[in-house]
From Swiss-Prot:
Any one of the GO CC terms: cytoplasm
Main subcellular location of this protein, as a coarse class: cytoplasm
The protein's role, per its UniProt record: Cleaves peptides in various proteins in a process that requires ATP hydrolysis. Has a chymotrypsin-like activity. Plays a major role in the degradation of misfolded proteins.
E.C. number: 3.4.21.92
Entry keyword set: Cytoplasm, Hydrolase, Protease, Serine protease
Molecular function as annotated in GO: ATP-dependent peptidase activity; ATPase binding; serine-type endopeptidase activity
SUPFAM superfamilies in the record: ClpP/crotonase
Record GO biological process: protein quality control for misfolded or incompletely synthesized proteins
Subunit structure, interactors included: Fourteen ClpP subunits assemble into 2 heptameric rings which stack back to back to give a disk-like structure with a central cavity, resembling the structure of eukaryotic proteasomes.
Name of the featured protein: ATP-dependent Clp protease proteolytic subunit
Organism in which the protein naturally occurs: Wolbachia sp. subsp. Brugia malayi (strain TRS)
Iron keyword on record: no
Catalyzed chemical reaction(s): Hydrolysis of proteins to small peptides in the presence of ATP and magnesium. alpha-casein is the usual test substrate. In the absence of ATP, only oligopeptides shorter than five residues are hydrolyzed (such as succinyl-Leu-Tyr-|-NHMec, and Leu-Tyr-Leu-|-Tyr-Trp, in which cleavage of the -Tyr-|-Leu- and -Tyr-|-Trp bonds also occurs)
Length: 208
């Protein structure tokens, strides 16, 4: 059983209890933790849409600690991140592997971070199917289609050529945050919260 801490907030109307994750959503912080699957993805998509409706001009902060998971679930989160108006700042804490690394890279350019001792991994999608030869061929072609789509997403967000992405994705590629920064998965390795604030000021100054 997972233990989720409860926090008590004092308001003018008295005390109110929140689970810790719901309280952090009030601060526009979303957690992507554990395997990426349909139920978790639905909650994250709902949180993104809610925070956009609350304030479409204020950043959302996504903290990622995930080994990856179901591609379609991950892509539903990815598409929503691109769809909504607020910038989504991503931060890797622990690990961002497979679909987790794609979500990390999909944050707003200039606002993608990793803590210094995190681990990041990219690879091509995998899957298995049993049945008639024709059915196996259909599913194999679908995996190849998904592989091409994921490669194109990494190409878009890292600035690398498609050929380079295909080479890196051929096998499991583990990297530390500094290597992830060099290949464009993140923008900066940070150790303290103040580093994010400094970076955001710099980005705003460049835009202005």
């Amino acid at each position: 059983m997972t233990l989720i801490p409860i926090v008590i907030e004092q308001t003018s109307r008295g005390e109110r209890a929140y689970d810790i994750y719901s309280r952090l959503v009030k601060e526009r912080i979303i957690f992507v933790t554990g395997p990426v699957e349909d139920n978790m993805a639905s909650v994250i998509v709902a949180q993104l849409l809610f925070l956009e409706s609350e304030n479409p001009d204020k950043d959302i902060y996504m903290y990622i600690n995930s080994p990856g998971g179901v591609v379609t679930a991950g892509l539903s989160i990815y598409d929503t991140m691109q769809y909504i108006k607020p910038d989504v700042s991503t931060l890797c804490i622990g690990q961002a592997a497979s679909m987790g690394s794609l979500l990390l890279a999909a944050g707003t350019e200039g606002k993608r971070y990793s803590l210094p001792h995190s681990r990041i991994m990219i690879h091509q999608p995998s899957g298995g199917y049993q049945g008639q030869a024709t059915d196996i061929e259909i599913h194999a072609n679908e995996i190849l289609r998904v592989k091409r789509k994921l490669n194109q997403i990494y190409e878009k967000h890292t600035g690398n050529s498609l050929k380079k992405i295909e080479g890196m994705m051929e096998r499991d590629k583990f990297m530390d945050p500094e290597e992830a920064r060099r290949i464009g998965l993140i923008d900066r390795v940070i150790a303290e919260r103040k580093d994010i604030k400094v970076e955001n000021i710099k980005v705003e100054q460049k835009v202005g």
